[in-house]
Amino acid sequence: MVREAGEVVAIVPAAGSGERLAVGVPKAFYQLDGQTLIERAVDGLLDSGVVDTVVVAVPADRTDEARQILGHRAMIVAGGSNRTDTVNLALAVLSGTAEPEFVLVHDAARALTPPALVARVVEALRDGYAAVVPVLPLSDTIKAVDANGVVLGTPERAGLRAVQTPQGFTTDLLLRSYQRGSLDLPAAEYTDDASLVEHIGGQVQVVDGDPLAFKITTKLDLLLAQAIVRG
């Protein structure tokens, strides 16, 4: 495969505790059938053939362990107290290097993401879109509710999508979004990177996601992932 011009860097924020999964270690370090989630996520990015460099942000006390697991496959940095801070710290690593053309941000918990999905996001970036997210249509009916549990309405499902990762951006747009967004609202207000782009008025394009790019968050998700990798 001949790689096109313009470097692509993938950031994997993996500094969270993963308390909902309750497996006794940070979620990214949980071994799924003999291989950690972070390892599977990084391998999926590299196997796509469109990612040049991977930067992984982990808890400060796990950096040595991450280096042992990933070896030369990724740069390791200490993450922050929340996802937004963690991505910011990973972006800071890029400031000392030649700026890549594109940056992907990918959840370690989406460890089974097919390489073809990664390539699809990068292809859309190279086609001229500045921000790209993979999505899936919703199958469940969604209700908007208030703090007391009273239903306020039923959004039209046809216009809703479930968002996955990797999310891709031109480097300049992502840096501007983080610089501006981090000043305007608390980091916890942003649940994904595209939200920061939306906040500064940027346009986000969707591409087809993949059911295998589901996020391993609960024990049920873990059982599904185990069944998939064991065939």
From Swiss-Prot:
Keywords from the named record: Isoprene biosynthesis, Nucleotidyltransferase, Transferase
Report the coiled-coil segments.
none
- Which E.C. number(s) belong to this protein? 2.7.7.60
Q: Which GO terms describe its molecular function?
A: 2-C-methyl-D-erythritol 4-phosphate cytidylyltransferase activity
Q: Where is this site: Transition state stabilizer?
A: 20, 27
Broad enzyme group: transferase
Site description Positions MEP for the nucleophilic attack, residues in chain: 157, 215
Catalysed reactions listed for this entry = 2-C-methyl-D-erythritol 4-phosphate + CTP + H(+) = 4-CDP-2-C-methyl-D-erythritol + diphosphate
Q: Which domain of life is it from?
A: Bacteria
List, alphabetically, the InterPro entries matched: IspD, IspD/TarI, IspD/TarI_cytidylyltransf_bact, ISPD_synthase_CS, Nucleotide-diphossugar_trans
- Entry keyword annotation includes Nucleotidyltransferase: yes
* Signal peptide extent: none
Which pathway is this protein assigned to?
Isoprenoid biosynthesis; isopentenyl diphosphate biosynthesis via DXP pathway; isopentenyl diphosphate from 1-deoxy-D-xylulose 5-phosphate: step 2/6
* GO BP terms: isopentenyl diphosphate biosynthetic process, methylerythritol 4-phosphate pathway
Q: Tell me, what does this protein do in biology?
A: Catalyzes the formation of 4-diphosphocytidyl-2-C-methyl-D-erythritol from CTP and 2-C-methyl-D-erythritol 4-phosphate (MEP).
Q: Which NCBIfam families match?
A: ispD
Q: Please give the family membership noted in the entry.
A: Belongs to the IspD/TarI cytidylyltransferase family. IspD subfamily.
Question: What is the name of the protein in this document?
Answer: 2-C-methyl-D-erythritol 4-phosphate cytidylyltransferase
Lineage here is:
Bacteria, Bacillati, Actinomycetota, Actinomycetes, Mycobacteriales
**Gene this protein is translated from:** ispD
